[in-house]
Amino acid sequence: MKRIDLIRQIESLGCILIRHGAKHDWYRNPNTGVSQPIPRHREIGEILARKIIRMLANAEPDDKNVRADQ
C-alpha cells in the first residue's frame, strides 16, 4: 500500500499526527487514545497497513500502545 493512501485512510478515521520521529511519524486516534507509528517508506506492506488501521480504528485501546500522559 502506498504511504499516502494509508495516511488518508487513518486521517479519515479521525486520527491526527502527533509527532515526527526519525524514521516514523506517530498518529493518534483522539477517540480511543491509541497511538501508532507510521513508517516513512513509499510502500508499506499490506499486512502492516491493515494492522495499523485495525489498531487505530479499534474502540478498545491496547495497553502497550497508549501512553498514560495523553
Task: Label the predicted regions.
Residues 17-20:
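Short beta-strand
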Residues 32-36:
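Short, charged/polar, Gly/Pro-enriched secondary-structure boundary elements
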Residues 27-31:
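Active-site beta-strand termini and strand-to-loop segments that position acidic
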Residues 26, 37:
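Conserved beta-strand positions that form and line the central face of beta-propeller blades
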Residues 1-14:
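Polyanion-binding surface elements
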Residues 23:
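A generic "binding-loop/recognition-motif" signal
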Residues 40-70:
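C-terminal structural segments of small proteins and small subunits
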